[in-house]
Amino acid sequence: MKLEIVTPEATLLNSEVVSVSVPGINGEFQMLDNHAPIVSLLVNGTVKFKGGAIKIEESFQDKFTKVDGEYQLSINSGTIEMKENKVIILAD
Protein backbone atom coordinates (compact mmCIF):
# COMPACT_ATOMS: atom_id res chain seq x y z
CA MET A 1 0.00 0.00 0.00
CA LYS A 2 1.06 3.59 -0.47
CA LEU A 3 1.80 5.82 2.56
CA GLU A 4 1.97 9.60 2.34
CA ILE A 5 2.86 11.67 5.42
CA VAL A 6 2.19 15.40 5.08
CA THR A 7 3.00 18.17 7.59
CA PRO A 8 2.42 21.92 7.29
CA GLU A 9 6.07 22.25 6.21
CA ALA A 10 6.37 19.48 3.60
CA THR A 11 5.46 16.02 2.39
CA LEU A 12 7.83 13.93 4.51
CA LEU A 13 7.17 10.56 2.92
CA ASN A 14 5.54 9.06 -0.16
CA SER A 15 6.45 5.38 -0.30
CA GLU A 16 5.19 1.81 -0.49
CA VAL A 17 4.81 0.13 2.93
CA VAL A 18 3.44 -3.17 4.25
CA SER A 19 1.99 -1.91 7.55
CA VAL A 20 1.20 1.36 9.36
CA SER A 21 0.48 1.80 13.08
CA VAL A 22 -0.88 5.09 14.38
CA PRO A 23 -1.86 6.64 17.73
CA GLY A 24 -5.66 6.88 17.65
CA ILE A 25 -7.98 8.48 20.19
CA ASN A 26 -8.84 5.07 21.67
CA GLY A 27 -5.33 3.65 21.39
CA GLU A 28 -2.90 2.51 18.74
CA PHE A 29 -4.28 0.78 15.66
CA GLN A 30 -2.69 -0.82 12.63
CA MET A 31 -3.54 -0.99 8.94
CA LEU A 32 -2.33 -3.63 6.52
CA ASP A 33 -2.66 -4.03 2.77
CA ASN A 34 -6.26 -3.67 1.51
CA HIS A 35 -7.62 -2.42 4.85
CA ALA A 36 -11.21 -1.18 4.83
CA PRO A 37 -11.61 2.56 4.21
CA ILE A 38 -11.23 4.66 7.36
CA VAL A 39 -10.90 8.28 8.49
CA SER A 40 -9.74 8.95 12.05
CA LEU A 41 -8.19 11.57 14.32
CA LEU A 42 -4.69 11.00 15.64
CA VAL A 43 -3.29 12.03 19.01
CA ASN A 44 0.18 12.68 20.39
CA GLY A 45 2.27 9.58 19.79
CA THR A 46 4.29 7.66 17.25
CA VAL A 47 3.48 6.68 13.67
CA LYS A 48 5.21 3.37 12.87
CA PHE A 49 5.56 1.74 9.47
CA LYS A 50 7.39 -1.12 7.78
CA GLY A 51 8.25 -1.89 4.20
CA GLY A 52 10.83 -3.45 1.96
CA ALA A 53 11.99 -0.47 -0.09
CA ILE A 54 11.03 2.63 1.88
CA LYS A 55 12.58 5.77 0.45
CA ILE A 56 12.94 8.84 2.68
CA GLU A 57 14.38 12.01 1.17
CA GLU A 58 17.75 12.87 2.68
CA SER A 59 16.52 16.24 3.96
CA PHE A 60 13.81 14.51 6.07
CA GLN A 61 15.74 11.49 7.36
CA ASP A 62 16.48 13.20 10.69
CA LYS A 63 12.74 13.28 11.48
CA PHE A 64 12.50 9.46 11.43
CA THR A 65 14.08 6.80 13.61
CA LYS A 66 14.48 3.15 12.69
CA VAL A 67 14.05 0.46 15.36
CA ASP A 68 14.19 -3.26 14.49
CA GLY A 69 13.35 -2.62 10.83
CA GLU A 70 10.43 -0.34 11.69
CA TYR A 71 10.46 3.39 10.93
CA GLN A 72 9.00 5.76 13.52
CA LEU A 73 7.85 9.38 13.43
CA SER A 74 6.65 11.32 16.48
CA ILE A 75 3.55 13.47 15.96
CA ASN A 76 1.54 15.82 18.16
CA SER A 77 -1.80 15.28 16.41
CA GLY A 78 -3.25 14.65 13.01
CA THR A 79 -5.74 12.93 10.75
CA ILE A 80 -5.50 9.68 8.82
CA GLU A 81 -7.43 8.51 5.79
CA MET A 82 -7.16 5.12 4.13
CA LYS A 83 -8.93 4.58 0.84
CA GLU A 84 -8.18 2.40 -2.18
CA ASN A 85 -5.00 1.04 -0.55
CA LYS A 86 -3.54 4.51 0.00
CA VAL A 87 -2.91 5.96 3.47
CA ILE A 88 -2.64 9.73 3.88
CA ILE A 89 -1.54 11.12 7.24
CA LEU A 90 -1.84 14.86 7.85
CA ALA A 91 0.32 15.43 10.92
CA ASP A 92 1.57 18.17 13.22
Protein language model regions, located:
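Compact, glycine-rich, soluble single-domain proteins
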Residues: 2-92
